[in-house]
Amino acid sequence: MRIQSLFVLFNVAIIAWSYPYEPLRVLQVGENEVMEVPESEKLNLRRRGVKFFDVTKHTSFLPFFNKEEEPTVPTYNYPPEISNKEVVDDSIKNIDKGSMHKNLAKFTSFYTRYYKSDHGFESAEWLAATIANITKDIPQDTLTIEHFDHKEWKQYSIIVRVTGSTTPEDIIIIGSHQDSINLLLPSIMAAPGADDNGSGTVTNMEALRLYTENFLKRGFRPNNTVEFHFYSAEEGGLLGSLDVFTAYAKQKKHVRAMLQQDMTGYVSDPEDEHVGIVTDYTTPALTDFIKLIINSYLSIPYRDTQCGYACSDHGSATRNGFPGSFVIESEFKKTNKYIHSTMDTLDRLSLAHMAEHTKIVLGVIIELGSWSAW
């Protein structure tokens, strides 16, 4: 591995020499593959479908370049069967697709949610204000909203934290990224980002609304802490979530489970509707539990699928030693082909399909919120 490390470092040095006048970004594009490129080349990689972590701010955490040196994801015991069906079903029946449509219409009305743009900051402000309104009746000793600032860009991540009553140190996280991008000209062209990832954001907002209305307002508290994360700058190389989970790792937080919702609204074939369970670069035991939730609460089946390295924000969790899982709208080959363009619009999406993803979130936070036999 030491020879391989020297080879990678040599490649980084060569690339850096080739672009002497541009600020360079350090990208991890594989488990043992790192490159240093200018910002313009970073965008070209995205256009070619190359996924990566932008670890420029976190180079001290690179595994040099040995996967065995990365933090180990613990093996936890997740519930072998569901135990809160009545509570979950009571919440599911109140999913409001009209409210989801209204929120997604507003969220996609921003010209772009590109994390470096003023529009991206404005969309984060709207999202934070809407979340605050959803949760306004919950006391601060139960629920808090954190604006997680990032030094290099204006759009902030949002963390909604419901503090556990018994074991607040055990954390369950539901994630989605709030930013969008037009890969043709990110700083100039519109990026409505309805599916990527307005759909996942609104899916989680609706779950938060129902959790607030049907659970928290009735005086119930989870035993474990439940958090909703709305990440900035996923499209820039998982920048926002990498900041968040790197901070959590440094603080030695106990994240027991993280579920990512990214692209939840597109159905390519209504006669073959399903959700996709990502099985690569995720945590198998947690993924199996998510399958249990789907079988228990959804009206459509799941299919296993693969998404590749650094596919979405769950990768930032597993990279930092936390269990991560990812549910997407379908098998990867059948996902929305209009993303990252002006054509990723609300009219192409199914609110009913998004509602199925909301059911997953409700099942996870209610079932794991009360679980203790880790």
UniProtKB/Swiss-Prot annotation:
SUPFAM superfamilies (UniProt xref): Zn-dependent exopeptidases (SSF53187)
Cleavable signal peptide: 1-18
Keywords of the record: Aminopeptidase, Hydrolase, Metal-binding, Protease, Signal, Zinc
Enzyme nomenclature, EC number: 3.4.11.-
Binding locations of Zn(2+) 1: 177, 196, 262
Cofactor(s) in the UniProt record: Zn(2+)
Cofactor-binding details, from the entry: Binds 2 Zn(2+) ions per subunit.
Gene3D superfamilies cross-referenced by the UniProt entry: Zn peptidases (3.40.630.10)
Protein residues bound to Zn(2+) 2: 196, 235, 340
Pfam families for this protein: Peptidase_M28
A single cellular component GO annotation: fungal-type vacuole
Domain of life: Eukaryota
Molecular function per GO: aminopeptidase activity; metal ion binding; metalloexopeptidase activity
GO terms classed as biological process: proteolysis
CDD domains: M28_AAP
Similarity comment: family membership: Belongs to the peptidase M28 family. M28E subfamily.
Stated name of the protein: Probable aminopeptidase YDR415C
